[in-house]
A protein has these predicted regions:
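Outer-membrane beta-barrel translocator/receptor signature
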Residues: 76, 89-95, 102-183, 189-196, ...
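Gram-negative outer-membrane beta-barrel transporters
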Residues: 442, 560-562, 566-578, 589-686, ...
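C-terminal beta-signal and adjacent terminal beta-strands/loops
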Residues: 27, 680-683, 702-766
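Acidic/polar loop-and-plug regions of large Gram-negative outer-membrane beta-barrel proteins
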Residues: 173, 186, 195-273, 298-344, ...
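Outer-membrane beta-barrel transmembrane strands
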Residues: 252-301, 338-383, 416-447, 493-511, ...
């Protein structure tokens, strides 16, 4: 999990919702009735291969993606969504579930991508999708389905991704090498009232992009802008060292081992899904889905920490950095800067069994639904961490690993000292939920629902206490069986928890006239920490996590305009996090639990002013602030690093967001479209010391239905060719506003905007 604060508050939107609220909560067979519109969920400025993360003014959490009504993965660390799911030809439907629907059916807060696998249809049907870009991406997706006679149907799918990324790295030709296979067999029975489907899926993925694109150097000017560091091009120059080998100390055994970064990020999944639906004579509909998955999940991070200026007067004579040249000869490093990085090798063996069943029935003026979840998750997980140093080349060449000969004779050091993790055991959630969508009168629609959930954790972790009852924390060469300086032996610690969680949601829409009305909704969720929260060296705050979300406003619809404007409030208590605070070359972990609250106002409009032209506009103002955000840590030299961010704007979340999405049908077969997203100023550290100016994310393209069976497309990502940094700045958590005033034109590292990219797509139906 490695809850590095600078990677977890990924930022975007308070409440990107609100279109066609009057139809928001119908619970019929049409999946769109439970979904949002106009979200462009697959237009992702952060990634070329996954769904866009739509935030709601809270810290980033698990991305909710459902396939056939079940989560694609129970927990996204260490098994990320993109390694086992893609928006490819294997899917018959993709949408975005509303916040209330996600809360009631899954117990999570936020939007969820809702997808369904393509089942067999009568006759023979095929879809072949192809995608490429000017960097060399080759992506293929194939679905073939048909009938076998006597109400038997089949569907087979293949997905292949060969993505070199936007810059070349030495360790592998691909930053994403993913293959996914699916096979389905369906039987309709009892005069097609019932349908049973068995599906097998296998996925194999190396998500190199997760660490290859994690950071890059730039010059922070001091006014919210950045400029390039020498010839280093943000987004098109690699910042990874040439060497692909990694030495680590196994958290479980204590033995030194070697791997490659490519092998360390191998993800594999083998899963079986059974689906059944049945329509009874009395109008009652029943569906049930069961999935078992056995997998290896892995996430690799190469997190930047301190940058040392060797030319600084304060550092003169302190360091003696060396490197090995292409012939293996040891030579003195004469560059100006050295970057310290923390390598985190996260991996776990996972077994999960997820079962969901629902009954629903339509009445004259309402629809009633009753559902049950039984979700079981077992994992054996650890994160092995290693520190190393590398060069920071200004000429755009590949970085090399270096070591300080005054301290050590090799590249790697401080094994498992920082952010190493371990937990093993199971998490089980048993939940019962219901929803009722009721047209009380012709003018008033009422939707309400509730969920009651029993959450049980049982297993072990490495949050070890000494004889005085204090957590030992991590130290160099930490592992199970190691001995701390005070004589405490590191041994697994048993843990067991039982919690009652609950959610409820209510929404009302009142039509004052045929075109104008009022709308509002309120969702309240009570959760407790997930198993992954027990991975660090200390126990998390196990108090309840409460998330209230309320919205109220107006809507107006006519023949050419649909407009909604709402005020929103959302908050969340007891966010568990671990800050890896840095002082000089030392890193200390500081766990804390804090609250967040966000007020906001959103206006969303969809207009069709003339034939062929559509325009979507969204404006959001929000003010997300920290509450109860205080922590401190004492470093080895006696320095006490303190943070009090209470009242500060949440890092990485903008206060103003704008979306502009015009499109025009040039002919009945050719569509031109663009999408503009504006993100205002964001703070790049917790203390509001560093910040990045606002920026636009832009997309544009043309779609051509060349024939009945062939469609072609061209998309340009970042067509304004904006370059720059975003997110947070590595190692900057303790920097204050007063200190930052004097920091100008200084080299730093962080994440960056996706570079200008031209993509080509083709889809053939046969």
């Amino acid at each position: 999990m490695n809850t590095l604060f600078n990677g977890k508050l990924a930022a975007m939107v308070l409440a990107l919702s609100m279109v066609n609220i009057s139809a928001a909560y119908a619970q019929d067979e049409n999946a769109n009735a439970k979904e949002e519109g106009n979200r462009n969920v697959m237009l992702n400025a952060a990634s070329a291969n996954g769904p866009r993360e739509i935030q709601i003014g809270l810290p980033s959490a698990d991305v909710n993606v459902l396939e056939n009504g079940l989560p694609v993965t129970y927990a996204t660390n260490p098994h990320s969504v993109n390694t086992i799911w893609r928006g490819d030809a294997s899917l018959s439907h993709q949408g975005l579930l509303k916040i209330a629907e996600t809360a009631i059916t899954t117990g999570n807060i936020g939007y969820a991508v809702n997808s369904f696998t393509q089942k067999g249809q009568k006759g023979f049907n095929g879809t072949l999708n192809y995608k490429s870009n000017h960097f060399g991406l080759q992506e293929f997706s194939l679905n073939m389905n048909g009938d076998l006679g006597k109400d038997w149907f089949y569907s087979v799918n293949m997905y292949q991704d060969f993505d070199p990324g936007t810059f070349k790295i030495k360790s592998t030709p691909y930053q994403d090498r993913t293959q996914i296979y699916k096979a389905l067999l369906t039987k309709k029975y009892n005069n097609e009232r019932g349908e049973f489907t068995a599906m097998y899926k296998y996925a194999n993925s190396h998500n190199v992009y997760n660490y290859a694109t994690q950071s890059a150097p730039f010059i922070y000017v001091g006014d919210g802008s950045v400029k390039e560091y020498g010839k280093f091009k943000l987004g098109t120059t690699s910042y990874l060292p040439i060497d692909n080998e990694m030495t680590y100390r196994d958290m479980r055994t204590g033995k030194l081992a070697q791997t490659t970064l490519y092998d360390a990020c191998l993800n594999k999944a083998s899963e079986v899904t059974l689906m059944n639906s049945y329509r009874f004579d009395n109008g009652l509909n029943w569906k049930a889905t069961l999935k078992y998955d056995h997998s290896r999940g892995a996430m690799v991070y190469q997190t930047p920490m301190a940058i040392v200026d060797l030319n600084s007067a304060d550092n003169h004579g302190l360091y003696n950095y060396m490197y090995r040249d292409i012939d293996g000869q040891t030579k003195a490093y004469n560059g100006q800067y050295v970057q310290t990085r923390m390598s985190c090798l996260n991996a776990g063996t996972i077994d999960e069994a997820l079962f969901t069943t629902e009954l629903n029935k339509k009445f004259k003026t309402s629809t009633l639904r009753l559902g049950l979840n039984e979700w079981f998750y077992h994992i054996d997980y650890c994160s092995n961490t290693t520190m190393y140093d590398q060069s920071v080349p200004a000429d755009g060449s590949y970085a090399v690993r270096v070591w300080d000969a005054n301290l050590r004779s090799g590249y790697f050091y401080d094994f498992n000292k920082n952010a190493s993790e371990y937990y093993k055991g199971s998490e089980n959630k048993l939940a019962l939920y219901f929803t009722h969508d009721w047209d009380v009168t012709k003018k008033l629609n009422l939707y309400y629902g509730a969920r009651v959930e029993w959450q049980r954790l049982k297993g072990e972790n490495a949050a070890v206490k000494n004889a005085q009852g204090n957590f030992v924390g991590r130290f160099a060469y930490y592992h199970l069986g190691a001995m701390a300086a005070d004589g405490t032996k590191i041994a697994p610690v048993d843990l067991a928890y039982n919690w009652l969680n609950y959610d409820f949601s209510v929404a009302a829409t009142y039509k004052l006239t045929d075109n104008f009305g009022f709308t509002g909704d309120f969702t309240y969720i009570v959760q407790h920490p997930k198993f992954e929260a027990f991975a660090p060296a200390t126990l998390p705050n196990t108090d309840k996590i409460s998330v209230p979300l309320g919205r109220a406003g107006i809507y107006y619809n006519n023949s050419w305009l649909s407009l909604t404007s709402l005020f929103s409030y959302i908050s969340k208590t007891n966010n568990n996090s671990t800050l890896n605070l840095q002082h000089g070359s030392e890193i200390k972990a500081a766990p804390l639990a804090y609250d967040i609250q966000t007020w906001g106002w959103t206006t969303d409009a969809v207009a069709h002013p003339f034939k062929g032209f559509d325009f979507h506009f969204l404006f959001t103002y929000q003010k997300p602030t920290y509450k109860k955000f205080e922590t401190s840590v004492t470093f080895n030299d006696g320095y006490v690093g303190k943070i009090n961010a209470t009242g500060n704007i949440v890092a990485e979340i903008p206060e103003i967001l704008i979306e502009l999405d015009p499109s025009y049908m040039v002919t009945k077969d050719i569509k031109l479209w663009t999408s503009f997203r504006y993100f205002s100023k964001t703070y790049a550290n917790i203390n509001e010391a560093y910040y990045f100016n606002g920026h636009w994310e832009t997309f544009g393209g043309v779609n051509w239905q060349a024939s009945k069976r062939l469609s072609l497309g061209c998309t340009v990502v970042n067509f304004l060719n904006q370059t720059g940094a975003k997110g947070s700045i590595a190692g900057a958590e303790l920097i204050t506003k007063d200190e930052a005033k004097n920091i100008k034109n200084q080299i730093m590292t962080g994440s960056y905007l996706r570079p200008f990219t031209v993509e080509f797509t083709a889809s053939l139906k046969f």
